[in-house]
Curated annotation (Swiss-Prot):
SMART domains the UniProt entry points to: RNA_pol_Rpb6 (SM01409)
Name used for this protein in its record: DNA-directed RNA polymerase subunit omega
Organism (species): Polaromonas sp. (strain JS666 / ATCC BAA-500)
Keyword Transcription: yes
Catalytic reaction(s) noted: RNA(n) + a ribonucleoside 5'-triphosphate = RNA(n+1) + diphosphate
InterPro entries given in the database record: DNA-dir_RNA_pol_omega (IPR003716), Pol_omega/Rpo6/RPB6 (IPR006110), RPB6/omega-like_sf (IPR036161)
NCBIfam families named in the record: rpoZ
E.C. designation(s): 2.7.7.6
Length: 67
């Protein structure tokens, strides 16, 4: 399986700070039981980054506040 890098994700979300926030929010959602948008057997943080790199998740994550 190919490794994910920050550079892959920065193509989708160019601001590093927004990228970290979006990935954190999404990883928290995944760890709370939300379904992943991609096939993944990785930990929630890696899955969140993979979703961002593939364009399945974007800046809309910043409009959602995880509970």
């Amino acid at each position: 399986m190919a490794r994910i890098t920050v550079e892959d994700c920065l193509e989708k979300i160019p601001n590093r700070f927004q990228l970290v926030l979006a990935a954190t929010y999404r990883a928290r959602m995944l760890s709370q039981g939300h379904a992943a948008k991609i096939e993944s057997k990785n930990k929630p943080g890696v899955t969140a980054l993979r979703e961002i790199a593939e364009g399945k998740i974007g800046l809309e994550m910043l409009k959602k506040v995880p509970s």
